[in-house]
Amino acid sequence: AVTLTCRRRMDKYELIGTYMPQGDGRLVWVDGPALIAWRTGAVLVINEMTSAPADVWVACNDLLEGDAIVVDRTGEVVPRHPNTRVIFTDNRPLGDGGETDQYLGRNAQDASVLDRCWHIACNFPKTDEQIELIWKKVSHLATGLDTGRARNIVRQVVRFAEEVRENNTRAYDNVSISNRGILRFVSMLFAFAKAPKKPENPVQLALGLTIANGLSAAAATGLQNALTYDHAAILSLVMKA
């Protein structure tokens, strides 16, 4: 796959390509991600699509129809490879330009662009699947810990994250916990569990360092309060001799 993460001041040429200066003073054309995908048949993955202005994607409607890319700066015409596909990812619906405490600077996208897309909502994996996915990522950090104990820490954190996700719109100031957040939280708990001298309140400290301290005061308080439901179980595993 060829990937591009959008930004507020993005323009179409970030997709197509541009001339780049070389050490000898020459300007050399460099293909952008869309042109690479059109040539090679790669999947073009556009992350955080609504961070870009709506007019960028309106200008790309011909690309979304599968038309050839006309590089006006070189005169080249590049037909789309039959295997090329375009995937947009975003944390907000593409037609929603509103902001929350989590996702700022978003732009509602034009109906003509939305009409050229399939729209698929991706949910988190089931509990057991998520536990296994997280364990595969962090198992190497559990060296020196009993495997059963380490897996139980993962299980407790996943269940805590699920509880927050289920209640995030009403109890925790619209905050959710991503899988990246789980990985950081578990990694810190493993480190504390292996430490010969434990810090005071290690579970709350780990949550603050890995997730809560980066949130608004209300959201951080909500997460710390939510942790009290699972705190005893996680703490007993971390502090266990």
Question: Can you name each region flagged by the protein language model?
Answer:
Residues 1-155, 159:
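AAA+ P-loop NTPase catalytic core and its hallmark functional loops
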Residues 118, 125-241:
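Alpha-helical lid/collar subdomain of P-loop NTPases
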